[in-house]
């Protein structure tokens, strides 16, 4: 982990990938418009939403490694480490990234609200998976915000517009996150129900007389899950 890119401001990453610097506290990058880039293991001093269709494989996020699904979002916050060490190869990525400095939020109600967006946490073990409609809406918002940054000088009025767009994007992400949690809760409930039925049938059939207490291995095989 010697070659870590320290993203102390949004424009550090913009310079790294060769994208225009649009604002000192916000960066919006359309990966499709920049040359193929090198991967980097990043130490984040900013908030970020990586909204992509083809993430590099074996990404690091905290102490974990994972492969992101197609059309998904990875959210990062200051103090986190994530990405992938430079492999020496140029890769082409399709999608967008929104980076914004905590300084932009100082003194705003959004600053206090950030703790409610739990998808920024290392404990969020999955990326946010978008359907085509969500992909279209979120990327359209980023495109519109980028246009605002390109056409207007920094001012209190522009910062209010920036915060409005960012809040809307974050709320879309929150809705996706809550949907995934609901789906995961339903899946967990279904597994538990199947497990209880399995144990009930096991004892009703008298299998304990020949096989003893059902083992983790046995239950996993019957439920088609790994015992680990």
Report the location of each language-model feature.
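Generic protein-terminus/edge-of-domain signal
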Residues: 1-68, 72
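Short beta-strand His + acidic residue motifs that chelate non-heme Fe in jelly-roll/DSBH
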Residues: 58-60, 82-90
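Conserved metal-binding segment of the jelly-roll/cupin
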Residues: 68-82, 99-102
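A hydrophobic/aromatic-rich effector-binding and dimerization subdomain
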Residues: 87-152
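Compact structured core domains
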Residues: 133-182
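A short, Lys/Arg-enriched amphipathic alpha-helix from helix-turn-helix/homeodomain DNA-binding modules
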Residues: 163, 185-225
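Key DNA-contact positions within bacterial/archaeal DNA-binding proteins
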Residues: 228
């Amino acid at each position: 982990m010697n070659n870590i890119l320290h993203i102390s401001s949004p424009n550090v990453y913009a310079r790294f990938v060769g994208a225009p610097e649009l604002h000192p506290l916000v960066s919006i990058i359309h990966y499709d418009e920049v040359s193929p880039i090198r991967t980097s293991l990043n130490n984040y001093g900013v908030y970020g939403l990586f909204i992509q269709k083809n993430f590099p494989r074996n990404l690091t996020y905290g102490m974990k490694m994972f492969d992101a699904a197609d059309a998904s979002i990875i959210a990062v916050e200051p103090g986190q480490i994530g990405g992938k060490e430079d492999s020496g190869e140029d890769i082409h990525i399709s999608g967008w990234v929104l980076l914004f400095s905590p300084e932009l939020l100082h003194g705003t109600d959004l600053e206090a609200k950030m703790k409610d967006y739990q998808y920024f946490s290392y404990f969020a073990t999955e990326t946010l998976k978008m359907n085509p409609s969500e992909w279209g809406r979120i990327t359209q918002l980023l495109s519109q915000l980028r246009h605002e940054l390109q056409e207007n000088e920094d001012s209190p009025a522009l910062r209010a517009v920036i915060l409005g767009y960012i809040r809307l994007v974050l709320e879309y992400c929150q809705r996706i996150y809550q949907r995934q949690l609901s789906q995961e809760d339903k899946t967990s409930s279904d597994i538990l129900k199947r497990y209880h039925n399995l144990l009930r049938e096991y004892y009703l059939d008298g299998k304990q007389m020949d096989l003893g207490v059902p083992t983790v291995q046995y239950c996993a095989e019957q439920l088609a899950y790994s015992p680990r």
